[in-house]
């Protein structure tokens, strides 16, 4: 079982490897805004739990288990960003909101949000209807 902190590291490592082909402790530390020694400790724990293989001074690679969860975590993050865009959350708030909620949702909830995103993507009319409801509610709230 992973903790939210472990998930943040696995997600970041997965993204770095996808983007650059590798992930170094210094890259992870910079991306997560943490001290390299904190990264080393977590990487050692993730190695022990078989999410990755870490060799000091040589770098790290994700195991199949680590790749699988990394891919799923990136999907979750991107899906939640997409969902918040669809429902009209201000762009500058989306990243922080996703970071605040992603670890607190079950995978069942994530799958249902995925269904809802698909529902809106399948018909532009649905998004138009949602925006009309939001506009009406904003006007009602301003009048109150």
Swiss-Prot record:
Q: How is its activity regulated?
A: DNA binding is strongly activated by Mn(2+).
Q: Where does Mn(2+) 1 bind?
A: 8, 99, 102-103
Record-level GO BP terms: intracellular manganese ion homeostasis
Please tell me where Mn(2+) 2 binds in this chain: 11, 77, 99, 102
Tell me if Cytoplasm is a UniProt keyword of this record: yes
**SUPFAM superfamilies reported in the protein's UniProt record:** Iron-dependent repressor protein, dimerization domain, Winged helix' DNA-binding domain
Q: Name one Pfam family in it.
A: Fe_dep_repr_C
**Superkingdom of this entry's organism?**
Bacteria
Q: Which PROSITE patterns match?
A: HTH_DTXR
- Entry's localization field: Cytoplasm
| Every HTH dtxR-type domain range | 1-63
A Gene Ontology cellular component where this protein is annotated is: cytoplasm
**Which keywords does the record carry?**
Activator, Cytoplasm, DNA-binding, Manganese, Metal-binding, Repressor, Transcription, Transcription regulation
Q: Which GO terms describe its molecular function?
A: DNA binding; DNA-binding transcription factor activity; manganese ion binding; protein dimerization activity
- What is the similarity comment for this entry? Belongs to the DtxR/MntR family.
Q: What does this protein do?
A: Central regulator of manganese homeostasis.
Subunit (UniProt): Homodimer.
Q: Which HAMAP family match?
A: HTH_MntR
Do you know which PANTHER family this protein is assigned to?
IRON (METAL) DEPENDENT REPRESSOR, DTXR FAMILY (PTHR33238), TRANSCRIPTIONAL REGULATOR MNTR (PTHR33238:SF11)
Q: What is this protein called?
A: HTH-type transcriptional regulator MntR
Q: Which organism is it from?
A: Bacillus pumilus (strain SAFR-032)
């Amino acid at each position: 079982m992973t903790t939210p902190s472990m998930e943040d590291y696995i997600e970041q490592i997965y993204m770095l490897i996808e983007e650059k082909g590798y992930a170094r402790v210094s890259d992870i530390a910079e991306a997560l805004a943490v001290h390299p020694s904190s990264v080393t400790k977590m990487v050692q724990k993730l190695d022990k739990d078989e999410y990755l293989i870490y060799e000091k001074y040589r770098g790290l690679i994700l195991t199949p288990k680590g790749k699988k969860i990394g891919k799923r975590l990136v999907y979750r993050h991107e899906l939640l960003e997409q969902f918040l865009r669809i429902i009209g959350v201000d762009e500058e708030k989306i990243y922080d909101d996703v970071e605040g909620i992603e670890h607190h949702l079950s995978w069942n909830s994530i799958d249902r949000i995925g269904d809802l995103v698909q529902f809106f993507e399948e018909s532009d009319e649905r998004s138009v209807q949602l925006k009309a409801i939001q506009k009406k509610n904003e006007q009602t709230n301003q009048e109150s």
